[in-house]
Amino acid sequence: METELCNMCMITDAEGRVLVQERLPKPSNPWSGLTFPGGHVEPGETVVASVIREVQEETGLTVSNLQNCGYIQWYNPVKQSQYFVFLFKTNTFSGELKDSVEGKVKWMTLDEMLAGSLAPNMIKYLAVFQNETIPQAYGISGQGLNLVDNNGILQ
């Protein structure tokens, strides 16, 4: 079974705002909407190093003091593949904010983000980012995403 590793990072500034990326749809990946920066783990790269690299590429910021928040696990029964997205958060960063080919980036309050056009399933990703008793979400392609609590119970 093929497994793909990815990452996503929630960055919070001193005013409590989060760095949001308005991801643009692409023919190879139609996933779009408000989300956090992140991407794929390259061969031979650690997950943490991939977060630092992806955030820098997509936002211009260099992050540090990353805290692991949990992960999202997707299963595709047609392709017999799985996809893991490791979630991190931090409030430690430096650099100048810049947009990238992935989308525009801007600081927003969580309420502003939630009122916007979220990327698919982003509300469930946020639950894992923000709740220590929900370390995982699990989904089957085309069937949605379920939260998983510390006892392995789907919610």
Which residues does each PLM region occupy?
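A short coil-to-beta-strand element that immediately follows conserved catalytic motifs
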Residues: T62-G70
